[in-house]
């Protein structure tokens, strides 16, 4: 066996497609391009995402909106944290000891009856109360 005698296995290779070489080849006349029109011309390229008239995937799927970068405050009802209302000072840590909220919380808003009375006790700028008296 020598390198010059090596051949690929029978049927493992295909002849390249030779278009436009007569009707008998099966790839003559229109050269595998179908009939007339834009798609038969040279330089034709379908738009990215074009699916032949079918509604494209990017139009079939629903829009996904953006999420705001401005953090919304975590809202807590004053009635749920009555123990905190009795304290002299209200801080984020004192609320955390009584009420669970996500660790990613940057601001807390206290709402409900009595929230405005707590405004003087709050010693943390990350905590606010509802505006109603």
From Swiss-Prot:
GO molecular function: rRNA binding; structural constituent of ribosome
Single GO biological process annotation from the record: translation
GO cellular component, one term: cytosolic large ribosomal subunit
Protein's UniProt keywords contain Thylakoid: no
InterPro entries: Ribosomal_uL15, Ribosomal_uL15/eL18_sf, Ribosomal_uL15_bac-type
Superkingdom, natural source: Bacteria
Keywords: Ribonucleoprotein, Ribosomal protein, RNA-binding, rRNA-binding
Region (Disordered): 1-60
Role: Binds to the 23S rRNA.
Family: Belongs to the universal ribosomal protein uL15 family.
PANTHER family to which the protein is assigned, alphabetical: 50S RIBOSOMAL PROTEIN L15, LARGE RIBOSOMAL SUBUNIT PROTEIN UL15M
Assembly description: Part of the 50S ribosomal subunit.
NCBIfam families associated with the record: rplO_bact
Name of the protein described by the UniProt record: Large ribosomal subunit protein uL15
Organism name: Wolinella succinogenes (strain ATCC 29543 / DSM 1740 / CCUG 13145 / JCM 31913 / LMG 7466 / NCTC 11488 / FDC 602W)
Organism ancestry: Bacteria, Pseudomonadati, Campylobacterota, Epsilonproteobacteria, Campylobacterales
């Amino acid at each position: 066996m020598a390198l010059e005698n090596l051949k690929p296995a029978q049927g493992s290779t295909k002849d390249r497609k030779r278009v436009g070489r007569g009707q008998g080849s099966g790839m003559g006349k229109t050269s595998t391009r179908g009939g007339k029109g834009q798609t038969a011309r040279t330089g034709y390229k379908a738009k990215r995402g074009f699916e032949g008239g079918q509604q494209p995937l990017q139009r079939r799927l629903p829009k996904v909106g953006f999420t705001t970068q401005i953090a919304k405050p975590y809202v807590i009802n004053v009635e749920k944290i009555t123990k905190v209302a009795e304290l002299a000072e209200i801080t984020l840590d004192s609320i955390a000891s009584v009420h669970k909220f996500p660790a990613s919380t940057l601001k807390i808003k206290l709402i409900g009856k009595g929230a405005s009375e707590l405004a003087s006790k709050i010693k943390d700028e990350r905590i606010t109360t509802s505006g109603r008296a």
